[in-house]
Amino acid sequence: MEDNRIQNQIAIYMTNKKLCEFTDKLKPAPVEYYAHMHAQGEEQSAGFRAYSCIGVVLQDYSNGKGDKTVRVTANLSPGFFPFVLSRMQNDLDRFDFTEEKIFGDPDENGLSTVTKLSIKRASVGNDGKRRNYPWCIIVENGRAVKEKTPTGGTHIKSGTYKKQRSVYVNINDLDFFNIVYRTARFIESWELTFGPKLIRDARKLLDDQRAAAQQ
């Protein structure tokens, strides 16, 4: 039944105009790379490459819901959440994190998907006054030409980026801590759930390989 559909939402912050949501997109590493625990782009048994991440969804429905809602998405690595949590526990005054990614197959115009993500904290605004909502999350989605780097990676080819949608959400300290803390705890629970089996499977394969080599 539709009412029983499993949701991958981990944590959510919502106002009457904006929404910020963290979602479960975690994936285990293949057994050959068991110690990675999280998939980091290693080739899977089916031949594709997977990445373990936390999804970020921002929505702006200040102009209305349905077709009028602006929705953007991005991904964060699992390691981001314990990192920012540790910074927040040390009387954090300023925080500045930006990341942009280009991925996916090019469309008929040679453009691939681009996500730009910014998470910043500033306790004082440009006017010198203390901010009640010091955290600002900005996600921008667009398209660009994917270009290979000399080291084998990819980046956005200069001058080709075309912005499609952008949403920002301002959050106070308590609400931001809550959604980050809940996500960090979920990641820990996920690792304690999938990690032991991954380690056991890898150890068994390793023991079998050693036994076969001694015959």
Region roles according to the model:
Residues G79-S112:
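Acidic, metal/cofactor-coordinating or nucleic-acid-engaging core segments within structured domains
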Residues A144-Q215:
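Mixed-charge, glycine-accented linear interaction segment located at domain edges/termini
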Residues S45-A50, A74-P78, K129-R130, S166-F177:
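Short, low-complexity cationic-aromatic patches
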Residues Y61-N63, F81, A144:
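Conserved beta-strand elements of beta-rich interaction domains across eukaryotes
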Residues M1-K68:
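N-terminal "first-domain core" detector
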Residues L58-S77, T154-V169:
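A cross-kingdom feature marking solvent-exposed beta-strand/loop segments within repeated
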Residues N90, D105-Q164:
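Short, solvent-exposed interaction modules
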Residues C53, T73, P134:
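Beta-strand-rich binding-surface signature
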